[in-house]
Amino acid sequence: MVSKILFGKKISWLLTIFVLWVIVFVLQKPFFLLFTGEGLSSLYAVLWHGLPLDLSLAGYMTAVPGLLLLLGSLPFHCVHTPFVKRVVSSSYQCWMVLAAVLVSLSFVANIALYPYWQFPLDATPLFYIASSPKDAIASVSYWQLLLGLVAVIGISFLIYSLFKTIGRRFSTTLCQPVSTLPWLFLLVFVAALFLPIRGGWSTSTMNTGKAYFSNHQRLNHAAVNPLFSFMESVTHQEDFSSMYRLMDEQQAHRLVSTMLSSKSEADSTVSSSFLTVQRPDIYLIVLESFSDTLMSVANVTPGLNHLKKEGVYFSNFYANSFRTDRGLLSILYGYPAPATVSLMKYPKKTAALTSMPQLLKQAGWDLQYYYGGDADFTNMRSFLINQGFLQIVEDVDFPVSQRISKWGVPDHLLFQRVKKDLRQTKTSTPILRVIQTSSSHEPFDVPFYRLNDKVLNAFAYTDSCVTDFLKCLRSSPQWNRSLVILLPDHLGAWPLDIDNFSFARYHIPMIWTGGAVRQPQKVDTFASQQDLAATLLGSLGIAHVALPFSKDMFNPAAPHFAFFMMNDGFGLMDAHHGVTYDFKRQQIVHAFGDKQQQYVQAGKAYTQTIFNDIATR
């Protein structure tokens, strides 16, 4: 009986610590809203959407006391000496002091710096302090420093006092042994902190993008836990300005100047003759892992093969990289996604970039995003909201019974939801609907059987889903004003065992179809995913000067080439010349044409320019 009471007290002590940390983090948010002049009208939404990050950080903060509790509860009386008890007790006190200071410092710094930087606390202050402490505080007055110091000390004292009071209530609990079975239960309980820390069992781990919910950035930033944001930034910190220093900046600028669209080209609003409607409804279907080679395999993509003949087929189109997060960046932002880093994980940087959906929204298009998986995977939510996608349909918007694949909802159910929403849409406003498929991805488990090969069968399934969706759209009143754009996020799974440095590794199809397309056409211009944005905007008569890396494939005055990056390498090609280059080996891997060294230098300059641009964001 005594053992059960003791076990209950230990569990209560740990739960109390966890709950108190959550309360501390929740209380930060109204203060942030008030200090930034936002008011409290959206407080409930801020608290609710910020709660997952608060729970995660509370899990981190409770993990150390949890480990100390396990040590102090070991079912071996020989280790429970006065010395061990003092060490455990002192360690707990030291941790609480440190935790209180860290939390208060992040809270005060976030409020103090936000009016100047307009983004949640991250590792940027560390960079400035490390590079020049004097310059870092040069613009701060003495009274501001003093006030900040007083605030940090005061808040630290309040937090520490709160936990010290709780510790006093359970002072005899921490260092008392329990029998083996209760200790094992304690171990399971402490290990369960992994769930709030990680954010559950889903494929995505906890990230700041989880808190994003509003088109008003300040509310998103209010929901973000500042210490969590700082920790995430520190662990993902990259010094982009020092990456890929391959040549003198003047030389790089000279080489790249001919590879970027000029301002006059980007300002061009001459509509393409490919479209019959100036402001069409746009359906952008992002096909998971499809390749151009796949379309030549018998009976796999009969739907796409038919669309290829009746629409506009881009025969020399290439993926910018090899992962979904990179592909989405290139497709939506018109940006050459670097292979060695995922910009989607840096909300501050993607918020500083202009995207094609943003420009469409400014021009009057209504935006909505459909994805059958977890929209918090790799910070996707903040990535989308930063572009203006406030309506995001994801796995949690479907019944649990329909989330039957590893990646969430199968493609046919995703398209059914799109069709349902379209039937209910009554608006004269042009729409942009981005539909991201996921079923043609490992483990390739799909509710469909036509081919013996599991991988090819999954591609055939997605092809059938697209075909059914377009059949439905074709019979609807929306068809005549519809522009449907199909392209993959990257090539994956087929062909098997393809060389990462081969040109074919990045060759993907792009097809434009729909009632708004004037006539079938084959476009042989060499281009990459990054060029879709400028091409689409130019076809709609919308300037794209804010997308300097994107090139209009229909504009004969624009430069035309395909660029892509693999891990620590790049590919650059056009109709006459091409190279893939390995930075690690510092050598050409594949090439054709007689200007190989010129293309290597151009590719190096382009890579250096990309990372220069990232560093400034």
Question: Where is each model-derived feature located?
Answer:
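Short alpha-helical "patches" and their helix-cap loops
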Residues: F83-V87, S242-Q251, M344-K348, F549-K551
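The feature marks either
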Residues: H216, A223-F228, E232-V270, Q278, ...
